[in-house]
């Protein structure tokens, strides 16, 4: 994973090979997490949500521009789940998902379960971004201590996410159902894919 925001630096050793593998116009999109894994020389070994403020936004914009220069295209930026509210934030999460694409000129990989889990865990109302959503991820999680939701990609897609998908889907978005373990019978996974496809089809036909 390449660091693109909170440290103010990018990782050329990651982006260089990616540029060599990039097959040009045949690739619809590539993505990176809107997160950091190290700062000040300290590696934390986990995706961490950066402070949602103008300092982070400026560093992110610089690094996205550098990624665009090296690879030729900018990544879609994926929102992450967090169990800790990022300190020093001046934007709400939903505001952040609107200002990041405008500041960087790139699009969002909107992970609906990450946003759903954060909203449940921190008690905010979801306002879905309407601009520059280039890809959508669906996944599931589980309830942990104190009623919080852990985004573990090991459970079925919650019903609420299909309603969110219907609100944000358009004809161009790529939708991916993620599952990283605790696999059910394959037919159940296919049913989630079919449900997502039908949700998008119905939503787009009503525009």
What is the meaning of each model-derived region?
Residues 162-189:
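Long hydrophobic alpha-helical segments typical of transmembrane helices together
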